[in-house]
Amino acid sequence: ELKVNFPVHNPAKWNTCKEEMNKLLPFLNGDYWNVEFRKETFDVQKAGLDKEYSVPFAQVSLLSGGLDSLIGALDFLKQAPKQRVLFVSHYDPQMHGPKGDQKDLIAEIQKIYSKQFADIPSLRVSLDRTNVSRETTFRSRSLLFLGIALIAAQATNTQSIIVPENGTVSLNFPLSPSRRSS
């Protein structure tokens, strides 16, 4: 069970969805969660954005390098030619495929839809300096993406976050009988 106390600017607002969070988080990674919220005293200074990120976006969308996110990206770009999307992604340096796939896909999408999107270069995520055994199931990828997407959406004042997922991952089958989801 994970018990986490999150610092937030408005704990009363977050407490209205605390029970939903405690139900949602286990679905995303299979662990049992107990979240609490406390008043954050640190004030985050908003930095100016590069020009390419200051143009409004209709949505922030995952571009993982996989087929589901590629189809989601192409569907949006084709169906909404006057709107822009901000692609976000992350990679684990131990897995060599996703980062290269993400770069290749961005390069190909750029050829046709260059004015309809921006991307935040794929963020490297790893636990290099830890003695904790390595997680090999990738069951937290969705949670990590949502965190990155929330930061990107807040920074660009974008209201919609899309996780294009159509396959078995979207069903989140448990990895073992002791898990509720993967």
Region locations from a protein language model:
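Hydrophobic/small residue at the entry helix of a nucleotide-binding pocket
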Residues: D68
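Metallo-beta-lactamase
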Residues: S64
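RNA-binding accessory domains that recognize and position tRNA/RNA substrates
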Residues: E1-S61, G72-R84, V88-S126, N157
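ATP-dependent adenylate-handling ligase core
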Residues: H90-S182
